[in-house]
């Protein structure tokens, strides 16, 4: 892409952040882990903000039940790999962007091989608290910048989404489990008054739970059940919330990279 073409495509970004900041973004390499309700929107925002290299990591295929919250889910993409559909979209947005596809799930075993210091930032959009904790601990101990996202399910009000240190979230069971795991299993700051130094996007909204009779309320159903945001059960979800989680994460990453 010629300098003129790049400036036409991202002139609005330059006029907002400045030329020096845009060059930093153009030279940045950012990983998005989990290309779902949060990660798909985060990847989109990165591409539309002139980030030069993006690595997408996820093993899932697109399911029809992803339609309510995931950017890549359309009638034409059902059954295709999320990383493939998303990579094609990102390169259509910015043909200069290099997009690496890793069609795999992150696990505690493969984190050291997949997450290295080649990344200027890692965006964690995983929904498994043990894997999230392993990823954050790896980044912490290897001085790789990471931002994590809390639970986006069961919430309706995107105006309550904010960023704080992972130790300071509230009304977020996923973030609570992650920080407990970090302290108990990974040795991060067992002093509860000390911060982790890891940004977390979360919502201060109280989650609502689906009830057996088809209603929703802030009380957990009597029979228990899943509290995950998955395809067939557990929390419901809204694009307005999951997308905002992704956008807020990218806004923080861009701010940190261009300061």
Q: Can you name each region flagged by the protein language model?
A:
Residues 32-34, 57:
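Conserved N-terminal Rossmann-fold NAD(P)-binding element of oxidoreductases
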Residues 38-39:
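Hydrophobic/small residue at the entry helix of a nucleotide-binding pocket
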Residues 2-6, 117-121, 126, 131, ...:
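Glycine-rich phosphate/adenylate-binding loop
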Residues 104-105:
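Conserved acidic residues
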Residues 1-31:
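N-terminal charged helix/coil linker that caps or initiates catalytic domains
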Residues 51-94:
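Glycine-rich phosphate-binding loop and adjoining beta1-alpha1-beta2 segment
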Residues 109-118:
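Short amphipathic alpha-helix with an adjacent loop that forms part of the alpha/beta core around
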């Amino acid at each position: 892409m010629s300098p003129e073409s790049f400036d036409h495509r991202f002139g609005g970004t330059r006029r907002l952040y400045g030329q020096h900041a845009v060059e930093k973004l153009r030279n940045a390499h950012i990983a998005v882990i989990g290309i779902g309700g949060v990660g798909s929107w985060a990847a989109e925002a990165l591409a539309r903000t002139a980030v030069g290299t993006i690595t997408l990591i996820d093993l899932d295929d697109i399911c029809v039940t992803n339609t309510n919250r995931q950017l890549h889910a359309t009638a034409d993409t059902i059954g295709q790999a999320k990383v493939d559909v998303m990579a094609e979209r990102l390169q259509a947005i910015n043909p200069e962007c290099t997009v690496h596809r890793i069609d795999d799930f992150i696990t505690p075993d493969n984190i050291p091989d997949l997450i290295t210091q080649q990344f200027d930032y890692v965006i964690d959009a995983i929904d498994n608290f043990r894997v999230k904790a392993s990823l954050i601990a790896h980044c912490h101990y290897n001085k790789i910048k990471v931002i994590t996202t809390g639970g986006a399910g069961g919430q309706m009000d995107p105006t309550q989404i904010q960023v704080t240190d992972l130790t300071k979230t509230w009304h977020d069971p996923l973030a609570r489990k992650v920080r407990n795991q970090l302290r108990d299993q990974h040795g991060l700051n067992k002093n509860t008054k000390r911060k982790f130094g890891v940004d977390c996007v979360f919502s201060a909204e109280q989650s609502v739970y689906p009830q057996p009779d088809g209603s929703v309320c802030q009380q957990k159903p009597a029979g228990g059940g899943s509290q995950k945001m998955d395809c067939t059960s557990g929390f419901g979800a809204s694009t307005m919330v999951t997308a905002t989680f992704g956008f807020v994460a990218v806004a923080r990453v861009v701010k940190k990279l261009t300061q």
